[in-house]
Amino acid sequence: MRSDEIKKGIERAPHRSLLRACGLKEEDFGKPFIGIANSYIDIIPGHVHLQEFAKIVKEAIREAGGVPFEFNVIGVDDGIAMGHSGMFYSLPSRELIADSVETVVQAHKLDGLVLIPNCDKIVPGMIMAAARVNIPTILVSGGPMAAGHTSDGKPIDLATVFEAVGGIKKGLIDEKQLIDIETHACPTCGSCSGMFTANSMNCLAEALGIALPGNGSILAIDPRRKELAKQAGRQIVELVKAGLKFRDIVNQETIENAFTLDIAMGGSSNTVLHLLAISHEAGIEFPMEKIDEISRKTPTLCKLAPASQYHMEDLDKAGGIYAILKELSKKNLLHLDRPTVLMKTIGEAIKDAEIKDTNVIRPLENPYNETGGLAVLFGNLAPDGAVVKAAAVDPKILVHRGTAVVFDSEEEAIEGITNGKVKEGNVVVIRYEGPKGGPGMREMLAPTSTIMGMGLGDKVSLITDGRFSGATRGACIGHVSPEAAAGGPIGIVQNGDEILIDIPNRKIELLISEQEFERRMKEFKPKKKEIPSPWLRRYSKFVTSANKGAILSDECS
């Protein structure tokens, strides 16, 4: 066992002495040491219940013959951090989480690892760490929130509240209606109830083979979630005994499986960033072009909020993630021989899964679209690619040619949109919000929700080198690479320029002459921004482009 390095032999008497002070007995020194990375925190609704949840995991580990060691991990609530300077810290927190989990695991030579995340950056951050340390790992998240309902019974969620803000500014709803939505949208603990970033990542963990069936869809308040915690605690001890490590499960083919599921279920566009980052940590090269290749052959089988009225509880009742995977396997779209934490292949694991509601999960014969819910666009405006959640775009605006209205920050954009600078037919451009330029690649949920709330969702497109919340819907193209701060062409767009967005043909073009394009690029000098935070200055210096997963470069030059 790895942990023998800190507990065996005469030289380790001081180490054992310290461990005895933690409550260990003599018999514990012959057992596997299992780390539990717990992201319990009081200010994130997806995490408020994780303290008790971790106790279930710990007890199951003890019963299975392991010694559990729980440690804490930070977290940021993207919804609460949204629309102000707090969002600068959201994506950077992913790197802090990865570094901190790696630090604890390696410093204490743990034999196995249970990850207990739930919300946006915490899930990928923990998985990135697991890819680095490469020990037996199982992820068991806290589960989704139940959908809310207005007084008249309409299903709602957090995205509804953001859009209601735009609605009240436009005069489409009154304050009483806003209060009704606000007070009913988030009724329980858990990760926000649609196919937003947190739930997307927790679902993808099933396709990666590192989570148990039901991890993505069983509600936080469902008694089955506690059973999942017990099973995870027992199973991690078996994984350690079997020596089945993270990279034994996750390889190039597994990442392809995850992207295939992601595209079929209409996952958040943020998942592209996170899966690319996880790939990097696992030593896997995964170009953006490969994602588009998968998207072109993968049908959209599922549309949950914000793309429809369905929520995670509906997906769970319809058969969950395994039902989607089983359907995809019928078209030979998956690598079925990849192992999982169940110690059986993904093909064996999904063998008995079935769709129980074809309104929520459509069969292959009746997909929402023949191609995928995520699309990667290329063109002179995004030579290294851009990402759009095509499943959440109104069909009327899948192809859009419009005039640019340019903003150099999210705050400028919100002010401009609410003050009427954006008209029907415009293409809103928000730049200097990329990984370096933000810094931190803020989510543009407030501008997009304002556009939707004002009734412009099928009349206006938005392009940014920032990113979007999983709750975003509409023609919102993010992750434009290279970003403006790195000298990308998005930095040369001027008010009134014509832009073509063609999602079916994967194009994004600035419609100016080649000579004018070259002249502007030659003269372009990216704006420099004052960054008061020492941490964010370091982040801005070392972070890479969105098409590389916005990971931190380990080159110190």
Swiss-Prot record:
Keyword Cell membrane in the entry? The reply is: no
> Per its Swiss-Prot or TrEMBL entry, what cofactor is needed?
[2Fe-2S] cluster; Mg(2+)
Q: Which reaction does it catalyse?
A: (2R)-2,3-dihydroxy-3-methylbutanoate = 3-methyl-2-oxobutanoate + H2O; (2R,3R)-2,3-dihydroxy-3-methylpentanoate = (S)-3-methyl-2-oxopentanoate + H2O
Residue sites binding Mg(2+) per the record: 78, 120-121, 443
Q: How is the cofactor bound?
A: Binds 1 [2Fe-2S] cluster per subunit. This cluster acts as a Lewis acid cofactor.
Gene Ontology cellular component annotations, sorted alphabetically: cytosol
- InterPro entries, sorted: Dihydro-acid_dehy_C, DihydroxyA_deHydtase, DiOHA_6PGluconate_deHydtase_CS, ILV_EDD_C, ILV_EDD_N, IlvD/EDD_N
Quick check: keyword Oxidoreductase in the entry? no
Q: What is its EC number?
A: 4.2.1.9
**What residues sit in the active site?**
469 (proton acceptor)
N6-carboxylysine PTM positions read: 121
Summarizing the function annotation, the protein's role is:
Functions in the biosynthesis of branched-chain amino acids. Catalyzes the dehydration of (2R,3R)-2,3-dihydroxy-3-methylpentanoate (2,3-dihydroxy-3-methylvalerate) into 2-oxo-3-methylpentanoate (2-oxo-3-methylvalerate) and of (2R)-2,3-dihydroxy-3-methylbutanoate (2,3-dihydroxyisovalerate) into 2-oxo-3-methylbutanoate (2-oxoisovalerate), the penultimate precursor to L-isoleucine and L-valine, respectively.
Q: Which family does it belong to?
A: Belongs to the IlvD/Edd family.
Q: Which PANTHER family match?
A: D-XYLONATE DEHYDRATASE, D-XYLONATE DEHYDRATASE YAGF-RELATED
Which protein is depicted?
Dihydroxy-acid dehydratase
Q: Which gene encodes it?
A: ilvD
